[in-house]
């Protein structure tokens, strides 16, 4: 049997930054009472798909969030066997170091969160390019991300439209370049006007999972047709009868996998661990610190 190994084009390594808003305010257009659970599950599937990329392509995944329930779920994901499961030669420390959660210190919406995350990523890993990725891509496949990042590596800044052609699912900046995120209505055109090279025509329909973000029930149906990840499948199987996220989406939870204050269970197969953050303090930006 012949095994094909993809190597990053031009030797470019990436830090992928994903913003995740408070779960109680997430996916308000998704007309389901369990939308908070689904928002978290889709984010976890997105993160796991990115982490399945080769380490020389994606050096780290940085999630920017202030949501405690998401924080807990991501921290338990940190030490799960899913991180780097297809790369058994990686040490546990090397696997967990790829997943970084930082607080959304601006706390002023999606774009300030991305600016904050990109700045910390560039300070910690100045030789890496930065990619801002939507956190609602439950059908994302690692080869799709590899293909998109390989194309993006040829440009100082690049953008990929969502399935509708008007929004943005991926915005990239080479090492030393400014990301300039402007996510929101008609963001694809806005990013193009700011100088980002459009990858949509080049990639076309070859990356359907990457372009299928989920905001509505119709979007969710299309993602399910493409094939969603294990966390989203579990959330959909649990259905409307699962506990919903409480108003404050608080609580760090315990090893049971449930956030005590929120009542939102971590999707099955994810075990307890520790959380790693990058914090800005007197020692300068980008210092790694562990939290119990």
UniProtKB/Swiss-Prot annotation:
Which HAMAP family does this UniProt record tie to the protein? Answer: CofC
Q: Which GO molecular function annotations are given, in alphabetical order?
A: GTP binding; phospholactate guanylyltransferase activity
- EC number, as in UniProt: 2.7.7.105
The pathway entry for this protein reads as: Cofactor biosynthesis; coenzyme F420 biosynthesis
Keywords for this entry?
GTP-binding, Nucleotide-binding, Nucleotidyltransferase, Transferase
Entry function: Guanylyltransferase that catalyzes the activation of phosphoenolpyruvate (PEP) as enolpyruvoyl-2-diphospho-5'-guanosine, via the condensation of PEP with GTP. It is involved in the biosynthesis of coenzyme F420, a hydride carrier cofactor.
Q: Which residues of this UniProt protein bind phosphoenolpyruvate?
A: 168, 184, 187
**So what does this thing catalyse?**
phosphoenolpyruvate + GTP + H(+) = enolpyruvoyl-2-diphospho-5'-guanosine + diphosphate
Q: Which family does the similarity line name?
A: Belongs to the CofC family.
Instruction: From the UniProt entry, list the residue stretches annotated as the region Disordered.
Output: 243-292
| Name of the featured protein | Phosphoenolpyruvate guanylyltransferase
* A biological process term (GO) from this entry: F420-0 metabolic process
Q: What class of enzyme is it?
A: transferase
Would the keyword Nucleotidyltransferase turn up in this protein's UniProt record?
Answer: yes
